[in-house]
Regions:
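Short N-terminal leader segment in a subset of presequences, especially plant chloroplast
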Residues: 9-12, 34
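Hydrophobic core
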Residues: 13-21
Length: 133
C-alpha cells in the first residue's frame, strides 16, 4: 500500500468515526424535523420500560397508542391530535391526552436515529426514530 493510499484510508476512517459523533447533540432545525420526524413513527422511551409510539403523519395529524404498555387501565389508551412546527420546535396537541393542552418540544440528536426531547415545561426524555408510516 502506498503512502497516498494509506493517508486516504486513514482520512476515510477518521471521517467515518468523527462524523456521527459530530452529529450528536445537534439541535433539530425546522427543516430537519420535517425531513427526519414527519412521516415517521417515533418511539418515546417510558420510565417503567418499553416504548410509546407516536405517528407524525404528513397531513398534520399525530396519533399514538399506549395499548401495548397497558395504559388502558389508567387512561385513554389511544388518542390523536395535530402537530405543527414553531421555529425549530415540534409542537403537538391531542384531543384528550394532557387535557388537550398544546405543547412544544426542542429536539436534540443524541446519535443515529436517537434524540432527546425537552418539553416547553422543562420535562425531558428520549426517543428513537422509527420507520416511515
Amino acid at each position: 500500500m502506498t503512502s497516498n493510499m494509506r493517508a486516504g484510508l486513514i482520512t476515510l476512517l477518521t471521517i467515518a468515526v468523527i462524523a456521527p459523533a459530530a452529529m450528536a447533540n445537534e439541535r433539530f432545525t425546522a427543516s430537519a424535523i420535517k425531513e427526519e420526524i414527519i412521516g415517521k413513527r417515533i418511539y418515546l422511551a417510558v420510565p417503567f420500560g418499553g416504548e410509546f409510539p407516536l405517528n407524525y403523519r404528513p397531513n398534520g395529524q399525530v396519533d399514538g397508542s399506549g395499548e401495548a404498555l397497558g395504559l388502558g387501565r389508567f387512561a385513554k389508551p389511544n388518542d390523536k391530535g395535530r402537530w405543527w412546527i414553531n421555529g425549530d420546535r415540534l409542537c403537538q396537541q391531542f384531543t384528550s391526552w394532557y387535557k388537550g393542552a398544546p405543547m412544544c418540544f426542542e429536539l436534540i440528536r443524541t446519535g443515529d436515529k436517537r434524540l432527546k426531547w425537552i418539553r416547553d415545561n422543562g420535562e425531558t426524555g428520549t426517543a428513537r426514530i422509527g420507520n416511515s408510516i
